[in-house]
Amino acid sequence: MVKKNKIIVTGGAGFVGTNLIKLFLKKTKLKIISIDNYSSGKKSNHIKNNRVKYIKGKTVNINKLIKNPKDIKSVFHFGEFARIFQSFSKMNECIDSNSVGSNAVFNFCLKNKIKLIYSATSASLGNNGNDKNLSPYAFSKSKNLELLENLKKWFHFKYEVIYFYNVYGPHQICKGPMSTVIGIFEDHYKRGKPLPVVKPGTQSRRFTHINDTVNICYYAWKKNLCRHYSIANKKSYSVIEVAKLFNSKIKFLPKRLGERYASALINKNLSNKMYKYFGEINLKDYINNFIFKNN
């Protein structure tokens, strides 16, 4: 019997993928394969370890990129297009990644009997589920959840789903169109520039540290219970509140397409109970520590 001693992390050179790989190197003896197209991932995120292999490629080509799928224990599919506002101007790229690419990953796992761990988004949950229609990004992600639900019914496909909430922390993107809110604020603070806040500024988010996020990813993988998890923070901040924590000047930007007023925290999605977990790392403490280090 072939020993399954490897996991795949799509988006392994990106923000979440890099932190997940670090955690798995620490907690397991598994070998790790990263698949990343480097649209937002960086070679500077590569971890020098003989247990990690980095492959440049698109998820749609996963069957060609992975020569021996019998070795693969699990796939963490985190390599999707992951920005709401940018999905309007880059809709083809969003659909290519989130629909076509993800379908290839799902089929790869199904065909080879590999467990999938999939990153979902809180952006599609609010307003009684209607927020899924706010942007191409939210729509594509919600359709993937519907597909997974049907794959479970049709083929008994096994997977875990983890809902992310405005993740921040080490390796986050700070510059360019794929930047995170906290990353943008940190970058502008370092450069002495006013922090950009999209109007009205009162839109609230449950900012969740990357360590809390990947710990739940690992927990879900380890427990192997085929559940839907959410990892958020108990405290919700408005964007303007967060900007003010930096004690810096603020400039307002025009309202944007697809903007949600609040992060949704629900008990159920589709037919699945949501197992809710809350992060331990406090955003205010994190920002205070950042300011201390940069003064």
Question: Can you name each region flagged by the protein language model?
Answer:
Residues 1-165, 290-294:
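N-terminal Rossmann-like NAD(P)+-binding domain of SDR-like oxidoreductases, especially those catalyzing
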Residues 10, 167-171, 197-207, 229-237, ...:
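Glycine-rich Rossmann NAD(P)(H)-binding loop
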Residues 128, 170-173, 240:
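Short beta-loop-alpha junction of Rossmann-like oxidoreductase domains
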Residues 132-140, 164, 174, 178-182, ...:
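The catalytic Tyr-centered alpha-helix of NAD(P)H-dependent dehydrogenases
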Residues 143-151, 181, 185, 242, ...:
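Hydrophobic alpha-helix immediately C-terminal to the catalytic Tyr-X-X-X-Lys motif of short-chain
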Residues 167, 183-196, 204-229:
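Alpha-helical substrate-binding/gating segment
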Residues 210, 238-241, 256-293:
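Conserved C-terminal active-site "lid" loop/helix of NAD(P)H-dependent oxidoreductases
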Residues 216-258:
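Mid/C-terminal beta-alpha module of Rossmann-like enzyme folds, strongest
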